[in-house]
Structure formats: structure tokens, C-alpha cells
A protein has these predicted regions:
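ATP/NTP-dependent adenylation/nucleotidyl-transfer catalytic domains that generate, transfer
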Residues: 1-160
Length: 160
């Protein structure tokens, strides 16, 4: 990995790019975008990442507008968008917050008005991707329940 070679040569850390929403549902690639020494935004939901980017640009434009306005994509296939297999982040993030931060069950989350099938799929994704989160580098904690520290789930137990 070129970035890791540069890191070793210069004594600097490689920063990863995964946010809490992506880490929650497994939209992070082991030894790809998860490879690094520090995960700056691993506890920041995707919607807040966009809010922070817009706020930063209000001070002075340093983030290209196309980065903020283009549809989110894992970029693993041509014309792929995250919403091909996920709900929009404006829906996903509140579901994740209820499940991860508030320990609400899928039934309790659905009772708040979310589609029960979407909630079930999202919560399954969270549980199934614990193994990836265990391999993530450390990062800043901004929430009540950060992955790897405050919320750990058994990997091999088969709990639902």
C-alpha cells in the first residue's frame, strides 16, 4: 500500500475516511479505506459529516462543492450509489442513532414511523458488520456510544 509506505517513511499517520454511518452498516473496505492509523470521523454520522463540510465552506471554500453535492457512493461499480442498497442517510442516521445510541429494538424504532423492513435490514447490517469495526483504527469519540469502546457486539454468537 503506497500510503502506508509513505507513512512509514515520513513517520506520519494515514487517516481513514469512514464515518459512523458507513462503519455501522459495513460500507467500509477492510485493508482499503479502513487501512490507516487513525479514524478521524469514525464516530461522526454521514449527515453530520455533510453539515460540517457545508459549515467549513461557509468560512472559506476548501472542500470542492461536487464532493458535497454528488450522490454518496462506495465507488465499487460504475454508476453505483449508496441508495441502491441503503435508505437515504437522512433516514438511515436516525435509525442508527436509535439502535446504537439509545438501544431501541427494531420494533421500537419502527413504532416511531420508520418502515419495519428497512429497520430490520439496517439493524441486521449493523450486527453482521461488527467484525469489520473490530479491525478499525482508533478515532475521536463524539457520541455516547462509540464503536469499539462503548458498543461491542459478539462476532460469532449468532445473536439477532
Amino acid at each position: 500500500n503506497l500510503l502506508m509506505a509513505i507513512s512509514n517513511k515520513t513517520g506520519k499517520l494515514v487517516l481513514t475516511t469512514g464515518n459512523k454511518s458507513e462503519m455501522a452498516v459495513g460500507y467500509a473496505t477492510l485493508y482499503g479505506d479502513m487501512a490507516g492509523g487513525f479514524a478521524v470521523i469514525k464516530d461522526v454520522p454521514k449527515t453530520l459529516v455533510y453539515d460540517l463540510a457545508r459549515y467549513r465552506n461557509e468560512q472559506s471554500r476548501v472542500i470542492p462543492e461536487r464532493v458535497i453535492t454528488r450522490a454518496p457512493s462506495a465507488e465499487l461499480a460504475p454508476d453505483q450509489e449508496d441508495t441502491d442498497s441503503l435508505p437515504p442517510y437522512e433516514i438511515l442516521d436516525p435509525i442508527l442513532e436509535d439502535f446504537i445510541e439509545r438501544d431501541l429494538s427494531p420494533a421500537e424504532i419502527s413504532a416511531k414511523g420508520f418502515d419495519p423492513e428497512v429497520v430490520a435490514r439496517v439493524t441486521r447490517m449493523v450486527v453482521r458488520n461488527e467484525y469489520k469495526r473490530r479491525q478499525a483504527p482508533p478515532g475521536v469519540r463524539i457520541s455516547r456510544r462509540a464503536f469499539g469502546r462503548d458498543r461491542r457486539y459478539p462476532i460469532t454468537s449468532g445473536f439477532n
